[in-house]
């Protein structure tokens, strides 16, 4: 048995080896697998086509069988079985009958009548709407009346969508220009707004800030300037005139030749004064030759490509510059080339107040009418030789309009009040009040000096009616000098050069408090002393005062006036300061 098993084992191994070799031989390449797949796909498509043909044949045969059975049933009068299965050539089919004739005397029919009615088809067929086609009118009788046209138009509007209706009802650009106040503000997209007339009214309103042009652009803002090379910044002409550009170039050339070590050293310790320009050149550049830069005006908004547009603000209609005359070849004293067209068609309607010589105003002196070279054409007149567009002959005298209206206020709305003007007005009012008070004090002192030398009876008569603020104008004093005497006095040589101020002992208060303080006498402190001395002098030496009245009383009077003026000025300053604090923003 052991020998038989050993003999069988090598045989099995040989069989395995042979099978492995056969598998390797039968292994297909990629191209073979691809070809087999294509072959299978072709077989599937062919089989599907054959199956479809077979199904169509079976379907035709089934319909023929159904028709035959329907005709047989109809001939026999048996319509009770509406769904019946029959078999023809092994095929099972169902016959469907359109209508069934039932016995009206059957009681079950009354019960199931509603059920049967639900399965009945409606006899009325739906009318399919024909496509809209143009109508051909062969006679006047076929013309629709107004009511029929409105009904037809209403029917057509019901068929249209909302978007198409909006487009039909939309105003055209020409109509909007005719209805607007200024046709030049109308743009082609204004007709699609909610209220085109109101939009054009807002755009035509004076001093209206326009909407930027890039509001309807679908691309990014300033994306059109990506490929444009920007110019380098150039200094203004008045700065270039100082010669600083040449000096900077020379300095840069010297720095280019310097070694790296020296450049690093100058970065740490730079040398100053390399660009030394004359002060007079700098002064003239910035104070004499400086020009105003181009700035965006009020109401202007930047848009893409604004810097590339021509600036026409400085240009005025009707003014022909010398450059334009040279470009058009207009000789001196000759008319412009568009004059003949204006004489024929009229002046431009956009400029109704523009004066054009030869159209609505006289031609210049030395010019002649006619169509010869240098002639100014034919004056625009009617059949009665009357000017059409204006005083082309210069016969009408200019009218001088008298200024009968109210004066125009030049003050801007919303302008802040100037406190200086208010202070000046207050000063004027205070001065009006000051002078009478000063005159009162001066006159009172004069009366005191005069009363010292008069008898008592005369003084009582003088002061019988007291002097008040309201009747101060009744007092008249002659030969009163209110100013101090400019001549040097006799005691000028005995005056002290300076005065020693007494020092006060104070405690230091605060972070920056003073350590020393001095007692400085003011005018208010000296005033009572002078008044006491004056009263003592008037009581003791009345006769001496009367004799020396012309020598010393004028100086004291001027001092009293100055003290009173100081008091009034201090009160006025305090009042204005309180007003400033009140109206301070």
Swiss-Prot record:
Localization per record: Nucleus; Cytoplasm
Alphabetical UniProt keywords: Chaperone, Coiled coil, Cytoplasm, mRNA processing, mRNA splicing, Nucleus, Phosphoprotein, Spliceosome
Residue ranges with Acidic residues bias: 416-439
Segments crossing the lipid bilayer: none
InterPro entries: DUF382 (IPR007180), PSP_pro-rich (IPR006568), U2_snRNP_Complex_Component (IPR052584)
Biological processes per GO annotation: mRNA cis splicing, via spliceosome; mRNA splicing, via spliceosome; spliceosomal complex assembly
Basic residues bias spans: 23-41
Coiled-coil segments on the chain, per record: 1-74
Phosphoserine: modified positions: 145
GO CC entries: catalytic step 2 spliceosome; cytoplasm; nucleus; post-mRNA release spliceosomal complex; precatalytic spliceosome; U2 snRNP; U2-type prespliceosome; U2-type spliceosomal complex
Chain intervals with Basic and acidic residues compositional bias: 12-22, 51-62
GO MF, any single term: RNA binding
Region (Disordered): 1-84, 400-460
Pfam family, one: PSP
Role noted for this protein: Involved in pre-mRNA splicing. May be involved in endoplasmic reticulum-associated protein degradation (ERAD) and required for growth at low and high temperatures.
Quaternary structure note: Belongs to the 40S cdc5-associated complex (or cwf complex), a spliceosome sub-complex reminiscent of a late-stage spliceosome composed of the U2, U5 and U6 snRNAs and at least brr2, cdc5, cwf2/prp3, cwf3/syf1, cwf4/syf3, cwf5/ecm2, spp42/cwf6, cwf7/spf27, cwf8, cwf9, cwf10, cwf11, cwf12, prp45/cwf13, cwf14, cwf15, cwf16, cwf17, cwf18, cwf19, cwf20, cwf21, cwf22, cwf23, cwf24, cwf25, cwf26, cyp7/cwf27, cwf28, cwf29/ist3, lea1, msl1, prp5/cwf1, prp10/sap155, prp12/sap130, prp17, prp22, sap61, sap62, sap114, sap145, slu7, smb1, smd1, smd3, smf1, smg1 and syf2.
Name listed for the protein in its UniProt record: Pre-mRNA-splicing factor sap145
UniProt gene name: sap145
């Amino acid at each position: 048995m052991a020998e038989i098993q050993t003999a069988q084992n090598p045989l099995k191994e040989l069989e395995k080896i042979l099978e492995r070799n056969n598998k390797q031989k039968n292994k297909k390449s990629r191209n073979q697998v691809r070809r087999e797949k294509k072959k299978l796909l072709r077989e599937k498509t062919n089989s599907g086509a054959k199956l479809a043909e077979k199904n169509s044949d079976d379907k035709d045969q089934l319909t023929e069988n159904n028709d035959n059975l329907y005709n047989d049933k109809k001939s026999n009068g048996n319509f009770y079985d509406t769904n019946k299965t029959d078999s023809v050539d092994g095929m099972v089919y169902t016959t469907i009958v359109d209508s069934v004739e039932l016995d009206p005397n059957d009681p079950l029919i009354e019960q199931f009548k509603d059920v049967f009615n639900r399965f009945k088809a409606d006899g009325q067929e739906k009318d399919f709407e024909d496509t809209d086609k143009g109508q051909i009118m062969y006679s006047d009788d076929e013309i629709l009346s107004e009511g029929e046209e409105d009904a037809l138009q209403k029917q057509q509007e019901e068929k249209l969508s909302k978007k198409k209706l909006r487009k039909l009802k939309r105003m055209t650009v020409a109509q909007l220009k005719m209805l607007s106040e200024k046709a030049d503000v109308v743009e082609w997209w204004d007709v699609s707004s909610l209220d085109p007339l109101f939009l054009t009214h807002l755009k035509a309103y004076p001093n209206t800030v326009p909407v930027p042009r890039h509001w309807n652009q679908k691309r990014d803002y300033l994306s059109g300037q990506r490929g444009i090379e920007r110019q380098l910044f150039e200094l203004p002409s008045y700065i270039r005139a100082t010669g600083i550009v040449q000096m900077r170039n020379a300095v840069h050339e010297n720095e280019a030749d310097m070694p790296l070590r020296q450049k690093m050293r100058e970065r740490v310790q730079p040398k100053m004064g390399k660009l030394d320009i004359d002060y007079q050149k700098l002064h003239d550049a910035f104070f004499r030759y400086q020009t105003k830069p181009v700035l965006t005006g009020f109401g202007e908004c930047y848009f893409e490509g604004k810097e590339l547009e021509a600036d026409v603000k400085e240009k005025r209609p009707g003014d022909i510059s010398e450059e334009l005359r040279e470009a058009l070849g207009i000789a001196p004293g000759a008319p412009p080339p568009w004059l003949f067209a204006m004489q024929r068609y009229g002046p431009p309607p956009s400029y109704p107040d523009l004066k054009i010589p030869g159209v609505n105003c006289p031609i210049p002196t030395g010019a002649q009418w006619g169509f010869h070279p240098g002639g100014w054409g034919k004056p625009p007149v009617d059949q009665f030789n009357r000017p059409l567009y204006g005083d082309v002959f210069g016969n009408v005298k200019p009218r001088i309009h008298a200024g009968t209206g109210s004066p125009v206020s030049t003050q801007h709305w919303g302008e802040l009040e100037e406190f200086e003007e208010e202070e000046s007005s207050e000063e004027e009012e205070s001065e009006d009040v000051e002078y009478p008070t000063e005159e009162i004090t001066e006159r009172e002192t004069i009366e005191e000096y005069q009363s010292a030398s008069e008898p008592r009876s005369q003084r009582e008569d003088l002061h019988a009616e007291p002097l008040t603020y309201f009747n101060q104008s009744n007092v008249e004093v002659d030969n009163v000098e209110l100013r101090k005497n400019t001549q040097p006095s006799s005691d000028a040589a005995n005056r002290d050069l300076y005065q020693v101020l007494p020092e006060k002992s104070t405690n230091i208060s605060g972070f920056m408090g003073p350590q020393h303080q001095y007692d400085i006498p003011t005018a208010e402190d000296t005033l009572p002393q002078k008044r006491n001395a004056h009263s003592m002098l008037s009581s003791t030496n009345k006769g001496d005062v009367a004799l020396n009245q012309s020598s010393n009383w004028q100086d004291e009077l001027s001092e009293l006036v100055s003290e009173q003026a100081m008091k009034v000025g201090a009160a006025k300053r305090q009042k204005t300061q309180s007003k400033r604090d009140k109206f301070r923003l």
